[in-house]
Amino acid sequence: MKKVVIIGGGVLGSQIAFQSAYCGFDVTIWLRSEGSIQRTKEKLAMVKQEYIDAINLMNTEEGKSFNNWCRGIADTDDFNVDKCLETVEKAFISINLELNLEVAVKDADLIIESMAEDFDAKKDFYKMMAPLVGKNTIVVTNSSTLLPSKLAKFTGCPNRFLALHFANSIWKNNTAEVMVQPSTEEKYFNEVVEFAKQIRMIALPLKKEKSGYLLNSMLIPLLFSGLDLYVNGISDPESIDKAWTLGTGAPKGPFKILDTIGLQTAYNVVLMYVKVPSFLAPYNFKGMEKLLKKYIDEGKLGMSSGEGFYKYDK
């Protein structure tokens, strides 16, 4: 593989693009509008700074600890701070931003769809892109909750379509869940596993489809539980986070995680559950929808906007 195309320049899309470029791939991000270009440039600049900060930390004794070492950047036995910083600069200037979809996907070896969690939007996009996809191009979705089998028939290449799911802050949390759907041919699954390794991810294969993969099957119930405690007036975000971090030793509680993921993404996931009858729903999804919409309407989208449940330095 040589050319990798990322569909969408959001939080994870920008990270996937940067990590792929950092590892030497020719990377293009496809964006829908002129307005998206500036927003994506800003996200890429933020990701670049995250890499620089991580590399500088890795060059200290504190940074050499297991919890601080960024395995997506370098191994401990061949770490060279100057070389890593130079690679970051090269990656940053090498990423192409493109508005023309046909131009973006031309000669692509791998297309990684990283759009918001909206089934209809994804379906419409795949139907639009299908005639443009090369006969040898592999297409993957980074969807957090949607099964790839639900989208496969719209891609035009179901045998070359599967899921490749990344954790947030992929330079540090370097896992890549690779999941088949019934039409996926094994050789393309193996190629995606190999790509994940080439961009310094730990590939986690899923032999069957599972909504939420491995990580989100465990993570989403945590986030829902935290939100449920808040919207039902049980406690506040900071106290809920402390209960989790101090009680388990985890670095972040549910609300810090929500800010990292982005509240728009969280809102889109909650919308998938709002219509569940209240007597069947294990959580107060309507309360969560109202809460998250209020934050989004106020421009509080999480870390990317400088404020969500917490405030951040931009």
Pin down the residues of each PLM region.
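NAD(P)+-binding Rossmann beta1-loop-alpha1 motif at the extreme N-terminus of oxidoreductases
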Residues: 1-73, 132
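NAD(P)-dependent Rossmann-like dehydrogenase/reductase catalytic/cofactor-binding core
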Residues: 2, 23-25, 60-61, 187-190, ...
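Structural motif
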Residues: 7, 91, 98, 114, ...
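Short glycine/serine/threonine-rich phosphate/pyrophosphate-binding segments
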Residues: 13-16, 120-123, 146-148
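Structural/interface elements that position substrates and couple domains in central-metabolism enzymes
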Residues: 28, 202-203, 215-225
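Rossmann-like NAD(P)-binding element
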Residues: 50-138
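Rossmann-fold dinucleotide-binding core
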Residues: 138-208, 216
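A general alpha-helix detector
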Residues: 174-175, 222-226, 253, 269-273
